[in-house]
């Protein structure tokens, strides 16, 4: 399945380029690094035998970055993707890609498992019980197939929609199995997008290209960061 990579604005996101502005962001950065280190670590013979017998440490199943918008969650998700690839095949997709699928969620998960060892799911926001149940089925199938999941969301899985409409397996998964399988890391802080916008000052030119081009070239020559649309 081609094209399952981070968006262009995060194509060069790394742990080094992430600048924590709060204690929880620093903790999230550390958790992301530790996940990559643990996943890439080559187990000893004893550990491999232990995994085969069902005891001893196993590879981490996933990491779930939870917090408000603009706190760097997607940057960290993309940084983990880049730190793992190409040695570890990873898929990166927005939650809307999952919900637009016409095939059953378990079939889509198995299709991903054929090519990828880690799946990065960005911006999990659920406003529909049907989509939430699709998400749970997809996640359970990925786990059963041995695919690790890295996710970002503004929504605590324990405060989900189906909590109020279902008392069955979906509810139990979100309340218990989710925390057993995935480490949840809180990422708090000011909205990067708003603080960066305040810190960046400059000029805006609105005119035909022939008139704005000389102004843009002059600004570039003066070392000003230029965005042209």
Residue ranges and their predicted role:
Residues 73:
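Conserved lysine of the Walker
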Residues 225-229:
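Conserved helicase/translocase motor-coupling segment
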Residues 85-116, 129-133:
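Short glycine-rich substrate-engagement loop in P-loop NTPases that contacts/grips substrate
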Residues 70:
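Walker A (P-loop) phosphate-binding loop of P-loop NTPases
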């Amino acid at each position: 399945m081609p094209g399952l990579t981070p968006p262009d604005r995060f194509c060069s996101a790394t742990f080094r380029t992430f600048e924590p502005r709060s204690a929880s962001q620093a903790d999230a950065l550390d958790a992301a690094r530790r996940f990559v280190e643990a996943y890439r670590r080559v187990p000893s013979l004893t550990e491999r035998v232990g995994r085969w017998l069902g005891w001893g440490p196993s590879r981490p199943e996933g990491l779930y970055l939870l917090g408000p918008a603009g706190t760097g969650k997607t940057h960290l998700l993309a940084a983990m993707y880049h730190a793992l690839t190409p040695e570890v095949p990873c898929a990166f997709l927005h939650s809307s890609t999952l919900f637009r699928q016409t095939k059953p969620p378990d079939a889509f998960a198995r299709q991903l498992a054929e090519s990828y060892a880690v799946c990065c799911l960005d911006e999990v926001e659920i406003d529909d019980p049907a989509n939430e149940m699709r998400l749970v089925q997809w996640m359970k199938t990925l786990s059963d197939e041995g695919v690790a999941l890295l996710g970002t969301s503004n929504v605590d899985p324990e405060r989900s929609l189906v909590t109020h409409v279902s008392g069955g397996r979906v509810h139990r998964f979100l309340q218990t199995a989710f925390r057993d399988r995935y480490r949840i890391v809180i990422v708090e802080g000011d909205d990067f997008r708003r603080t960066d916008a305040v810190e960046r000052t400059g000029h805006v030119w609105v005119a035909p290209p022939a008139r704005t081009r000389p102004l843009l070239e002059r600004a570039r020559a003066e070392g000003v960061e230029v965005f042209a649309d």
